[in-house]
């Protein structure tokens, strides 16, 4: 009888430990996604200058490099279902939309020099369906 009670207690303790561990891992994942999204979400529907645009592009490129996101034949990052981030920027003075790769290829320092006093606004954001991480930002020049 004692042996049966001990076995049941050990099984119950193992189940509680497993549930606690799973919940802890889930909360850790949620916190990491929230921390990642916070880097970009402060720019959503807000006006900011060209220097901040350079920061956004650098964050997106650093994320893609860190997560080994592949590039296509034109040098643009391929969208995946988990970690990729894309940024497109519409410039009113040229009436064209540029990808972050195009702007980065023209050197971020040139972007900062030419657009540091120009205002931009992030008007569209998309999230990965699988993990709710930011996957796409559309930014428009507003002045």
Describe these PLM feature segments.
Residues 1-3:
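Positively charged n-region of N-terminal signal peptides that target proteins for export
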Residues 5-21:
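Hydrophobic membrane-insertion alpha-helices, especially the h-region
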Residues 23-143:
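N-terminal export/assembly leader peptides and their processing motifs that target proteins to secretory
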């Amino acid at each position: 009888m004692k042996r049966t009670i001990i076995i049941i207690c050990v099984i119950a303790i193992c189940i509680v430990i497993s549930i606690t561990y799973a919940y802890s891992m889930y909360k850790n994942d949620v916190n990491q996604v929230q921390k990642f999204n916070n880097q970009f979400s402060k720019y959503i529907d807000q006006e900011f200058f060209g220097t901040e645009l350079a920061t956004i592009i650098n964050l997106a490129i650093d994320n893609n490099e860190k997560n080994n996101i592949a590039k296509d034949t034109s040098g643009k990052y391929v969208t995946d279902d988990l970690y990729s981030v894309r940024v497109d920027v519409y410039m009113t003075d040229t009436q064209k939309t540029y990808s972050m790769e195009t702007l980065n290829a023209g050197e971020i320092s040139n972007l900062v020099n030419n657009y540091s006093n120009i205002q931009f606004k992030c008007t569209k954001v998309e999230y990965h369906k699988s993990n709710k991480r930011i996957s796409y930002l559309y930014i428009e020049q507003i002045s």
